[in-house]
Amino acid sequence: MKKTIIAALVMLCCGWMTATAQIEMYGGAQKTEDFLSQSKQFGTKPDPNFWLFICIGQSNMEGAATPEEQDYAWNDPRFQVMAAVDFPANTGRHKGEARKKYQWYTAVPPLCRAHSGLTPADYFGRTLVENLPDSIRIGVIHVAIGGCKIEHLMKEYDPQTVTKEAGWFQNIMHEYEDLPYTRVMECALRASHQGVFKGILLHQGCSNSGDKRWPAMVNKVYKDILNDLHLEAKEVPIMAGEVVNADCGGVCAGMNPIIQTLPETIPTSMWISSAGLPCGPDHLHFSAEGYRGIGRRYAEAFMKYKGIEKKQQLVDVKVEKKAKKAKKK
């Protein structure tokens, strides 16, 4: 069933027929990979200077902190977000025009949904723009669901099981038609005709806290994304951020040692430290300052992986001081 849906998405992106007709006509007749391969001949030629990143995860990727004025002040069109859901104008934390699903917009927060907040992706993208040549543009595809397990992001996830979840969780999942992986593909297939994928950002773990199977499950999600988009792992690394650190009283900090083992399972992965980054009063989510800091750390890790020389200090001085103080404890 999942292959049928994703195959239909490729047909839709190519403009051949409606999604409903695709599912009815092509139900399992072709492998997903065949359709993805065929789709490459359609659309515009990708711009090699438009660097694309997939951002997935749960509430810390979704963004819990309210953006502040300095965050809303961003207006550089070199950093863009493809809306993964429709945004009504001036709704929730979204201050501005309505956003339509699958369209690109200057990456002013919130990036995920109208009622979400500041995310690691915000300052990841801004930091890259500030450190890369003016010819390079950054685009993010952002799909995140507060409270989700890594299993909810898998290609094999059964949407019929969402009815067993809490009502608030179901409401978020419904915005992605209960299939987050499929929504990632819907966006990514469109974007693949416009730019080139350079990496995947993951921030997830609280809902799988203590589960030593987590690295293997992340690897499954990673491999499926690479295979379905015909990407090479060495060209598209995955970066996984730690949850709120023990030095800030993080209630899920016990997951961080498991996150740190991800490179043992995925050689083209990196884990991003959360040491010293401030959090909110729930000790589950970062504060706005914490999101800025971890976003910069994602960017620094990516630039180091790609051998890109940074032009400036990437982490706030006061955040860095907190990290050093924490290490002395």
Enumerate the predicted regions with their spans:
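Bacterial Sec-dependent N-terminal signal peptides
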Residues: 1-23, 326-327
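Cell-envelope and extracellular/periplasmic
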Residues: 22-329
